[in-house]
Amino acid sequence: MNSRRRPVKKDSEALEISIPFDETPHLDPQIFYSLSPSRGNFEEPSEAASPTAALMNGVRAQLHLALERNSWLQKRIEDLEEERDFLRCQLDKFISSARLDADDHCRGKPGPRRAEGDGRGGTGGEASDPESAASSLSGASEEGSTVERKRQKQKGGPGRRRFGKPKARERQRVKDADGVLCRYKKILGTFQKLKSMSRAFEHHRVDRNTVALTTPIAELLIVAPEKLAEVGEFDPSKERLLEYSRRCFLALDEETLKKVQALKKSKLLLPITYRFKR
């Protein structure tokens, strides 16, 4: 050990003190460990932040899907409610027509009883007066024939009127674009008066889906007739009316669709959804 001795004088006495210069001081290594920053402390926030961002992205995606599904379900509910109202109107109309037929049938039943009563009166008068008996018998026979005719009419006539004519009206189909436009305008006028789509379709005896399938033709002719040149005229020998309606639907651009939606909100067009998809 290298050390230097320095004499120190105190009270006329010399003292020797040894001071080591070459020795390194002994320090506890735990002190340096406690002062040095930990790497894990800086890495933990980044690791914790990445799962949070992934979780937020997943929640946003699920929320977006839920909103789209909600809007789709809302449209579906509106369509089902309109179809329900239409079916209710059809059912009420059928019940009322059945009641009217039942009332007519009940009114026609007392006829034969009156005829039988007249016949009995005629037979009673026959014993007293032959001429009155003959006249009563002839009147009874005429009345019986009229009652029989009424029965035949009730059996055949009302049934044909109730089931035949409405079916014939329902089966009437338009054959060209002009017919589609004419029918659309009639239903639109009725809708503006009655304020109900179902009642308007019932009034004209037209199915809602049938009108929805041909609506693009009428809307194109009303809102953007200049686009008819792009679509072309309808030729029944080359395509069906449904295919022509689809081509008209594809010809409606974004600007035209915005005009159509604005007119539907103001009740200047039928607020009916399309049956085609792009």
Curated annotation (Swiss-Prot):
The modification Phosphoserine is found at residue 128. Residues 102-119 have a biased composition (Basic and acidic residues). InterPro entries: CCDC106 (IPR031591). It holds the Pfam family CCDC106. Residues 150-166 have a biased composition (Basic residues). It is found in: Nucleus. Residues 131-144 have a biased composition (Low complexity). Keywords: Coiled coil, Nucleus, Phosphoprotein. GO terms for cellular component: cytosol; nucleoplasm. Its main location: nucleus. Residues 61-99 form a coiled coil. This is Coiled-coil domain-containing protein 106. It comes from Bos taurus. The gene is CCDC106.
